[in-house]
Amino acid sequence: MDPYMIQMSSKGNLPSILDVHVNVGGRSSVPGKMKGRKARWSVRPSDMAKKTFNPIRAIVDNMKVKPNPNKTMISLSIGDPTVFGNLPTDPEVTQAMKDALDSGKYNGYAPSIGFLSSREEIASYYHCPEAPLEAKDVILTSGCSQAIDLCLAVLANPGQNILVPRPGFSLYKTLAESMGIEVKLYNLLPEKSWEIDLKQLEYLIDEKTACLIVNNPSNPCGSVFSKRHLQKILAVAARQCVPILADEIYGDMVFSDCKYEPLATLSTDVPILSCGGLAKRWLVPGWRLGWILIHDRRDIFGNEIRDGLVKLSQRILGPCTIVQGALKSILCRTPGEFYHNTLSFLKSNADLCYGALAAIPGLRPVRPSGAMYLMVGIEMEHFPEFENDVEFTERLVAEQSVHCLPATCFEYPNFIRVVITVPEVMMLEACSRIQEFCEQHYHCAEGSQEECDK
């Protein structure tokens, strides 16, 4: 029997609950007025709501610039592969959903951590000798975002801190700060294909550090860490006894010239909570099915972390049951050709975009190795009329109707993030417009006229 299934009966021992609505001798004991409460309206948002802040929304929503009405808008800012319709999921995936819906078996509640059969499928799919998994090691969630939310909630208390990459996915900070958790930013190095500055990372760790977040492959960088670099990260975590939250939502989405290494396959010493989901690899972000894989071969987490994840998952009573019902077919029947074609398209677009932008004076793109993005440095000294990356992107929208995300959204100013999921024709047009924009606004830095005359 699934150890997480709780059987309730009328003879169960439930905690007593004080009910103030009782009658004694036919008279109500409910007081006419509660002491200490002033009878006037005073409804205010909670501290958690007030501390919740999404940098992307704050920056993008405050951009007042309208696109050029003479040019069709091209958005290179949204990390949703379904937006343009050129990257549909595989027919086997949609058929699996139809079959699950038509069966009528998945219209009710499931255990809050997911059906046992669905967790068994995930465990089987990701199991390997270097990182064995069973159903008890899997928590199903409402998307990878909720998986990250649960991991932070189970590992860190208010007043503790977590280590987050810079540049990095803004949701880490949004979730952590809403819980009263301090965020410490460790640097990724563009000159080293966005590897972690390991010395700075280790320097940030203190007695209040609750976990280290490692995002590989990376959003927003499109980088993929080598096996050797991952081993160095694990060595830091092992030395400092810091557990890892591995955001691996883009796992296996790497280009043909490199290899993806799941972090848990490289260590038996460091406890790891790996977060993933259907959203990106299967191109269905709206279906909201994610998971946490608990890797803890030395039993450092013990029962408390596992039980904590179960309790936290009960706050929303689990992810969509219909998607859970389709999960076996999605995992088993999606053809390898689907994954190959998706990655071939992304690599082709990445090469196209990188080549075009690298030829533009004043821009310094960093070649990606996976995921759906690349980062582009702006040599701001050559664009003196713009104060920062936010102004650069605002004017790019106003003049060329091309929208990229300023990397200030990812705590990394004077870069922009480009999404590479758009159709090829659109990518070519966007790069052409970016070139035109840069040529119009580029200025030689003082003392470098010779370079400009080339």
Curated annotation (Swiss-Prot):
Its EC number is 2.6.1.5. Its cofactor is pyridoxal 5'-phosphate. GO terms for biological process: 2-oxoglutarate metabolic process; biosynthetic process; glutamate metabolic process; L-phenylalanine catabolic process; response to dexamethasone; response to mercury ion; response to oxidative stress; tyrosine catabolic process. It is an enzyme of class 2 (transferase). It catalyses: L-tyrosine + 2-oxoglutarate = 3-(4-hydroxyphenyl)pyruvate + L-glutamate. GO terms for cellular component: cytosol. GO terms for molecular function: amino acid binding; identical protein binding; L-tyrosine-2-oxoglutarate transaminase activity; pyridoxal phosphate binding. PROSITE patterns: AA_TRANSFER_CLASS_1 (PS00105). SUPFAM superfamilies: PLP-dependent transferases. InterPro entries: Aminotransferase_I/II_large (IPR004839), NHTrfase_class1_PyrdxlP-BS (IPR004838), PyrdxlP-dep_Trfase (IPR015424), PyrdxlP-dep_Trfase_major (IPR015421), PyrdxlP-dep_Trfase_small (IPR015422), Tyr_aminoTrfase_ubiquitination (IPR011715), TyrNic_aminoTrfase (IPR005958), Tyrosine_aminoTrfase (IPR005957). Keywords: Acetylation, Aminotransferase, Disease variant, Intellectual disability, Palmoplantar keratoderma, Phenylalanine catabolism, Phosphoprotein, Pyridoxal phosphate, Transferase, Tyrosine catabolism. The modification Phosphoserine is found at residue 448. The keyword Acetylation applies. The modification N6-(pyridoxal phosphate)lysine is found at residue 280. The modification N-acetylmethionine is found at residue 1. Pfam families: Aminotran_1_2 (PF00155), TAT_ubiq (PF07706). Pathway: Amino-acid degradation; L-phenylalanine degradation; acetoacetate and fumarate from L-phenylalanine: step 2/6. Changing residue 294 to A: Reduced catalytic activity. Transmembrane segments: none annotated. It is linked to Tyrosinemia 2: An inborn error of metabolism characterized by elevations of tyrosine in the blood and urine, and oculocutaneous manifestations. Typical features include palmoplantar keratosis, painful corneal ulcers, and intellectual disability. Belongs to the class-I pyridoxal-phosphate-dependent aminotransferase family. Transaminase involved in tyrosine breakdown. Converts tyrosine to p-hydroxyphenylpyruvate. Can catalyze the reverse reaction, using glutamic acid, with 2-oxoglutarate as cosubstrate (in vitro). Has much lower affinity and transaminase activity towards phenylalanine. Homodimer. This is Tyrosine aminotransferase. It comes from Homo sapiens (Human).
